């Protein structure tokens, strides 16, 4: 009954939940750090009807249900301790939802806890994500796949791995990449009427490709379409 009551209360208000993978327990209600839950799964269950779910993760490793966390029409904010100490294992799918993540590492490289051959993060049908001071570890496909009029904003985030692209944007979507680090080989691709902004990138400087009708801005300047991968530092080259 207490769990049912908690879910009912969450349907009418913003709900804040604390989770601690090391010292928490799912028998608690998660309302304070001292009463922290142990799993992200229970935190998502208790906040499933909240208009806004705010989840604080203590340092530790967390897994998502069935390897993929799917958010449908939800508003979820997840705050970690630091990206170096707070790891979320699995893949994320956001559909018509808003997801904010700060100071968290998303890792989809282990087949026991994730689907390594899939996109690490997928945004579809007007979804939105904001990632600040995060790390994304990807084994296959794209680190972030953005489609169907969705939008993404990355600040101070490092993207690693990816057999295809760090950020793949299509379907009238847009992505803003600020002071991020690219540790992939192909960087960004803009297609399908999308718009991409890259500012103050480091690492491989987010090499990009874009189709003829897509718009890419690098450090505030619009660049010409590039069908082969180039670094943003070469944007003024005629070739």
Task: Put a short name on every predicted segment.
Residues 3-42, 61:
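Right-handed parallel beta-helix/beta-solenoid
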Residues 41-56, 61-74, 84:
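N-terminal, post-signal-peptide segments of secreted/periplasmic proteins
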Residues 1-20, 219, 223-239:
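Glycine-rich, low-complexity segments
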Residues 65, 74-122, 132-139:
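Right-handed parallel beta-helix/beta-spiral solenoid domain characteristic of secreted/periplasmic
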Residues 85, 108, 138, 143, ...:
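Residues in short coils/turns that link rungs of repeat/solenoid architectures in beta-rich domains
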Residues 57, 77-80, 99-103, 128-132, ...:
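All-beta strand scaffolds that present successive hydrophobic residues in beta-strands
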Residues 121, 129-131, 144, 167, ...:
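Fold-core signature of tandem repeat domains
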